[in-house]
UniProtKB/Swiss-Prot annotation:
NCBIfam families xref list: PRK00913.1-4 (NF002074), PRK00913.2-4 (NF002077)
UniProt remark on cofactor binding: Binds 2 manganese ions per subunit.
Source species of the chain: Acidovorax sp. (strain JS42)
Gene: pepA
Catalytic activity: Release of an N-terminal amino acid, Xaa-|-Yaa-, in which Xaa is preferably Leu, but may be other amino acids including Pro although not Arg or Lys, and Yaa may be Pro. Amino acid amides and methyl esters are also readily hydrolyzed, but rates on arylamides are exceedingly low; Release of an N-terminal amino acid, preferentially leucine, but not glutamic or aspartic acids
Record's GO cellular component terms: cytoplasm
Organism placement in taxonomy: Bacteria, Pseudomonadati, Pseudomonadota, Betaproteobacteria, Burkholderiales
Protein name (record): Probable cytosol aminopeptidase
Catalytic center residues: 263, 337
Amino acid sequence: MNFELKTLSLAASAAHKCDLLVVLVPEGFLPGSDVLSTMVAHALKQGDLEVKPGKLLQCYAPAGVAARRVVLLGCGAADAHAVRQAMQALSPSFKLPSVKRVALVFGTSAQRGAIGAAVRAVADGSYVYTATKTKAEPRALLRVTLGVPNAGAAQPEFATATAVAAGVEFAREWANRPANHATPTLVANAAKTLAKYPGVQCQVLGPAEVAKLGMGAFLAVAQGSDQPLRLVELRYNGAARTQAPVVLVGKGITFDTGGISLKPAAEMDEMKFDMGGAASVLGVFRALAELRPAINVVGLIPACENMPDGKAVKPGDVVTSMSGQTIEILNTDAEGRLVLCDALTYAARFKPAAVVDIATLTGACVVALGGLRSGLFASDDLLAEQLLSAGDAALDPCWRMPLDDEYAEGLKSNFADMANVAGRAGGSITAAKFLQRFVGDTPWAHLDIAGTAWKGGAAKGATGRPVALLVHYLLDQATVSTVKPKQKTRSRKSVA
């Protein structure tokens, strides 16, 4: 699917040939004398159309319009939130087999973030999972044209939005795949494909190299599976070599049974999504490859399965992490923090400016925040503010949670330096306190995406969050935001 940005007035859009023309109608719409403006004005006057976000009126083959179908779509204040809400009401149309070319025209100048919201809504709404289906219909939508009053002024936001959409889709695709189609080795192979882009490098370590590094916690989780672990190291080099990188660490449990502390059978299939953090790191690098910001980024993915087996780690076992600290594993289903702690220790070798880990870590975070906001834990106030701001701008919000030292009391162990769990109370916080022991003085943040990485029910599937948040954060840190595409075409291709 290709996205295209054009300078297109409401009057000119009437001559644009497409299967679906969407006219976003904001509050205070001022009609001109052209056919579409007249149509909007009449619909508003007769009460057939409201400007409330998501209210719409459909017309088929109206006179004087080249599009086969026209949708007049209310978008309220026309800000990012209102445009997203409006576009979600239209989402089913983007999967219709007859809709191959869509034009989306803003009735007035688009507010900051509105173009990004529109691009993301179309990309998300038209996404079709086909990887393991033999008769699945592929995505029908081939081209999306965004018409704005001034394409040149909108170009930076458009470039970011299309790159983020591609990254989100890459993350969704890998998080959606069944565990036998997304083993640690296959996830590592997906990371290697990103190295074809300029500025991106990939290195993959196997069990022998990980053992040599002394990653006893990571090895302990993986030892119950026949699938060999992989430690993926992605690098994006967009700035001077002397510039300290931001390190992203994504939890990559490609299937989580809970190990010996076995999970209930109901909905265990959803544990293929336990590599949502890893998928988000892949998605971020997919977006960075397009945007090429002036920043250095390292992505680490400790990938393995957590399986019950005669070789599996047992409750009560004590292991030595890469940091040298010993851990009593009271619950083998608290495995994500075990693979992350060694990856966080490994991250120190890059002398990072900041470290952000991303993990579907705790059910407690789902209880606390639901599926709207990711949980944010941070050792540094400035880093926390930067991530909160980026999440708001990207419509991928998070919420800062506490990290008081007293929460770590429950991690005390009689047989090791610490236990891997501290009881049910404050479970998401105690998990973050566990991770904090492995980051030293480096500014560090932990995003618990257990409630936001996927959704259940009829629309079960990965969301691709928090790719948008992370990309916006990295762009904010970069000295040069993007390399502009050729002005002539103003088009971007997303992941198909």
